């Protein structure tokens, strides 16, 4: 599939992004301003997650699978290449869990021949970057890398699928 070019949106986040799906499914009594404040207050976890996503993107682009022998290499990349203090990694995330998720995600994305970090666009206020995506034979596959303590939410993937349908003019019933 030839995806549209949205390179001008790389490393940007939309207000109405699938990653912050709570705007679309806000529970009654939830204050969105408090939610956004809490998200930004966990800056190291976000920085580490961004670095792990970048490592995953590079691995998928080069089709280089991760294995248990590269765990220390990933830790070294975080501390040396991304200049994240080792203490911040220890306090900010469960590195063993994050590495396990990273390994599964990278290896699965390579196995399914997925494209990493694909921007799906509807408007300047509603776009998001799918961590890994493929669309072949009317089968849409979207994977989302989770490296933190937050729960995985199907709503985020549903919004990515909706953005795909809107951008590429597919009706949901046309997709398996």
Show the residue positions of the predicted features.
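Catalytic cores of nuclease domains that cleave nucleic-acid phosphodiester backbones
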Residues: 44, 48, 55-142, 148-155, ...
């Amino acid at each position: 599939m030839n995806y549209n070019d949205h390179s001008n949106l790389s490393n940007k986040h939309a207000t109405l992004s699938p990653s912050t799906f709570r705007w679309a499914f806000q529970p009654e009594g939830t204050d969105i301003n408090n939610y956004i404040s809490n998200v930004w207050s966990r800056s190291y976890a976000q920085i580490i997650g961004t670095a792990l996503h970048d490592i995953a993107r590079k691995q998928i682009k080069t089709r280089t699978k991760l294995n248990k022998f590269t765990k220390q290499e990933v830790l070294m990349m975080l501390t040396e290449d991304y200049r994240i203090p080792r203490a911040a990694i220890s306090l900010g995330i469960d590195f063993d869990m994050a590495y396990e998720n990273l390994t599964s995600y990278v290896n699965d994305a390579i196995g399914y021949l997925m494209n990493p970090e694909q921007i799906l666009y509807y408007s300047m206020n509603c776009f998001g970057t799918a961590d890994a995506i493929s669309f072949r034979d009317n089968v849409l596959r979207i994977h989302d890398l989770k490296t933190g303590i937050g729960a995985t939410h199907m709503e985020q993937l549903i919004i990515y699928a909706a953005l795909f349908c809107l951008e590429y003019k597919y009706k949901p019933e046309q997709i398996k």
